[in-house]
């Protein structure tokens, strides 16, 4: 850090000492919540390990109207419903691999926006992350959704997401010990502390056109890295919610099970409100004509 940057940080702090004290407090609370994640997961999982150069990609679909109906019927948020469906997908994937799910959770990194209310509508990216635990042990879909909603509400008030963004903003003024701890958290988080990544990107809810042609659907892709063998991205567009699942081809050629599990998770939550929801076998038939892509 240059002397100029240090002076600028001190000047900013001098102009708003109460704000700096408040931000340091927010960082401290957030880092306290990070501490439990520094311990590696006690359960070995096929979701983690060395990854090769090739990928398999597959997808799942849902309707935003169905997700909103589930939210209206059972409570929670759209994001809670999406995470509940993904949880069911991972549950089915693990069971299909013969791995136990009793007493088990899947830790996932969830990127979130940390814009303040006043910053909404701005174009700069202010993104941090929360660490959620997907309760794959819960078989009942409504209980699963309730558990996720309670957890996400707690995480939103825990300061996890605020911590990383505040540390960047404080720059050269935060105590050296706090910055050192934040650096270790941000760059040395053990890969075994997380099992997967789930990123939700809201898209436009009106149709888009190019050269007079309407874009019918858009599917996201999430890259893999470290020891994470499977990642899930979610993109909503024009009344639809599409899931893109990336897997390491060598270790996870079966991510189609995860995709079907995601669709089943939506159908399970929707069925009390819409008993005529398509069955798993009905949805599986067209998928057999659309094999997943290996790269």
Segment roles from a protein language model:
Residues 1-228, 232-295:
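Soluble acyl-CoA-dependent acyltransferase catalytic core bearing the H(X)4D motif
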């Amino acid at each position: 850090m240059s002397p100029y940057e240090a002076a600028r940080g001190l000047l900013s702090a001098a102009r708003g000492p109460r704000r700096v004290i408040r931000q340091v407090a927010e960082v401290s609370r957030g880092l306290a919540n990070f501490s439990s994640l520094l311990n590696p997961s006690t359960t070995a999982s096929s979701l983690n390990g060395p990854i090769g150069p090739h990928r398999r990609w597959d997808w799942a679909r849902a309707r935003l109207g169905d997700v909103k109906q589930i939210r209206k019927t059972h409570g929670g948020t759209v994001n809670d419903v999406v995470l509940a469906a993904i949880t069911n997908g991972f549950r089915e994937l693990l069971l299909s691999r013969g791995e136990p799910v009793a007493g088990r959770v899947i830790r996932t990194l969830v990127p979130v926006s940390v814009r303040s209310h006043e910053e909404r509508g701005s174009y700069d990216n202010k993104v941090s992350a929360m660490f959620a635990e997907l309760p794959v042990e819960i078989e009942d879909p409504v209980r699963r959704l309730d558990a996720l909603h309670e957890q996400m509400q707690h995480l939103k008030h825990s300061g996890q997401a605020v911590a990383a963004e505040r540390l960047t903003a404080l720059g050269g003024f935060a105590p050296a010990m706090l910055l050192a701890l934040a650096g270790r958290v941000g760059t040395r988080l053990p890969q075994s502390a997380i099992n997967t990544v789930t990123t939700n990107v809201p898209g436009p809810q009106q149709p888009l056109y190019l050269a007079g042609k309407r874009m019918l659907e858009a599917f996201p892709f999430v890259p893999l890295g470290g020891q994470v063998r499977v990642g899930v991205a979610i993109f909503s567009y024009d009344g639809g919610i599409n899931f893109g699942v990336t897997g390491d081809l060598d270790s996870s050629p079966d991510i189609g099970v995860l995709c079907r599990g995601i669709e089943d998770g939506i159908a399970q939550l929707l069925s009390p409100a819409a008993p005529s929801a398509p069955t798993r076998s009905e949805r599986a038939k067209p998928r057999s004509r659309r094999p997943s892509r290996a790269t």
